[in-house]
């Protein structure tokens, strides 16, 4: 009788093995810089005098929108006793459109950019001892071809002297194309075209030691930045040829007695 009662409480639970994913992301931005009665010689350059507002008045309108479609296939973590991690493979197509005043100030000039990227993600979130999340994405076709993003983080947790110790690490490496408005901009008083900018290289390595009971934390990180793109004081685009290093250190200790 007891065996029959136990069997009656058993139930089958469906655990999905694979997910097919599609995401659509749309963004639209519009910016207007409007000014009247600009002081004489206030701006160094004037590229057109006509437009919506002529003379010394300014009406610079910039538009930008992008449409991004991502398709992914995911093998879910835990669907099989031998599958200790989840795996996702994805591909993305992005369309970007930009619109700014043309050289007459009356019409408008537009630019279109397409990009195709592929990537993968490996992650483990279940369990209490080990977790990790690794992701890689590279751009194959388009304006940003050659871009690369590598991200990784992991943590190990274990008990020590009535406390829980966590050792965590995080790192990333990015090779990124400077964004559109570093490369092109058109307005009544500011205008530039920079098609030969180098890709920025960003590297980050971080280690974290923490104790749960005493809320003690020590974090050390190193950042390296190469080919940094920036504006000079006169709005000329520059690319730094030197490496920039940052080493932040955080020590956080809160100790209290448990009665």
Where would I find each of the regions flagged by the language model?
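Exposed, low-structure sequence patches enriched in small/polar residues
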Residues: 3-259
């Amino acid at each position: 009788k007891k065996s029959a009662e136990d069997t009656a409480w058993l139930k089958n639970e469906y655990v999905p093995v694979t997910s097919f994913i599609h995401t659509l992301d749309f963004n639209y931005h519009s910016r207007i810089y409007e000014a009247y009665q600009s002081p004489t010689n206030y701006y160094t350059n004037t590229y057109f005098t006509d437009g919506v507002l002529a003379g010394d008045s300014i009406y610079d309108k910039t538009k930008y929108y992008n449409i991004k479609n991502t398709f992914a296939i995911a093998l879910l973590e835990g669907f099989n006793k031998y599958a200790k991690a989840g795996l996702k493979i994805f591909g993305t197509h992005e369309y970007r459109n930009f619109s700014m005043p043309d050289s007459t100030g009356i019409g408008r000039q537009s630019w279109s950019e397409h990009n195709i990227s592929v990537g993968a993600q490996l992650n483990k979130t279940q369990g209490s001892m080990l977790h990790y999340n690794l992701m890689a994405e590279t751009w194959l076709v388009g304006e940003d071809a050659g871009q690369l993003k590598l991200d990784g983080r992991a943590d190990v947790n274990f008990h020590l002297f009535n406390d829980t110790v966590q050792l965590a690490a995080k790192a990333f490496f990015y090779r990124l194309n400077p964004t559109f408005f570093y490369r092109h901009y058109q307005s009544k008083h500011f205008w530039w075209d920079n098609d030969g900018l180098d890709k920025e290289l960003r590297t980050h390595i971080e280690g974290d030691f923490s104790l749960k009971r005493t809320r003690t934390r020590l974090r050390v990180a190193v950042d390296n930045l190469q080919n940094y793109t920036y504006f000079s004081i006169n709005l000329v685009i520059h690319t730094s040829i030197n490496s920039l290093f940052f080493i932040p250190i955080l020590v956080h200790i809160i100790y209290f007695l448990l009665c």
